[in-house]
């Protein structure tokens, strides 16, 4: 991914995870998915995805061998871009605000 001042819609979303044992496993699970790119730094791991990223807590619990939920996601993540939706069983990042609004049933049209 290149940084710059391009004003066109990128159709990308992403999050920065702490490079800890838990963050590493989460990054590895996400990096195995189609359309997901990992960029590693000494203290953090960027997870960038095309259109949408789904952090499924059951999938991550299985990979970690211990419970994973929204509080742990919040603990290991810092910055993000895209629209974030937290559910009981997953966190979803959407590249498009319209897609996120449709997913949660929010009407973006002015009345």
Curated annotation (Swiss-Prot):
Listed GO MF terms: monooxygenase activity
Induction: By propane and acetone.
Superkingdom assignment: Bacteria
Pfam families, per database record: MmoB_DmpM
Record-linked InterPro entries: MOase_MmoB_DmpM, mOase_MmoB_DmpM_sf
Family annotation (NCBIfam families): PropMonoxMimD
Family: Belongs to the TmoD/XamoD family.
Subunit: The propane 2-monooxygenase multicomponent enzyme system is composed of an electron transfer component and a monooxygenase component interacting with the effector protein PrmD. The electron transfer component is composed of a reductase (PrmB), and the monooxygenase component is formed by a large subunit (PrmA) and a small subunit (PrmC).
Biological role: Effector component of the propane 2-monooxygenase multicomponent enzyme system which is involved in the degradation of propane via the O2-dependent hydroxylation of propane.
Name this polypeptide is given: Propane 2-monooxygenase, effector component
Organism: Gordonia sp. (strain TY-5)
Lineage, top ranks: Bacteria, Bacillati, Actinomycetota, Actinomycetes, Mycobacteriales
Gene: prmD
């Amino acid at each position: 991914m290149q940084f710059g001042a391009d004003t066109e819609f990128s159709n990308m979303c992403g999050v920065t995870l702490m490079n800890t044992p838990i963050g590493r496993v989460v990054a590895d699970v996400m990096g195995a998915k189609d359309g997901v790119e990992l960029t590693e730094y000494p203290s953090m791991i960027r997870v960038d995805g095309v259109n949408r990223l789904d952090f499924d807590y059951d999938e991550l619990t299985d990979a970690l061998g211990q419970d994973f939920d929204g509080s742990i996601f919040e603990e290991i993540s810092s910055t993000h871009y895209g629209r974030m939706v937290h559910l009981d069983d997953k966190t979803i990042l959407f590249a498009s605000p319209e897609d996120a609004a449709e997913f949660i049933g929010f009407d973006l049209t002015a009345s």
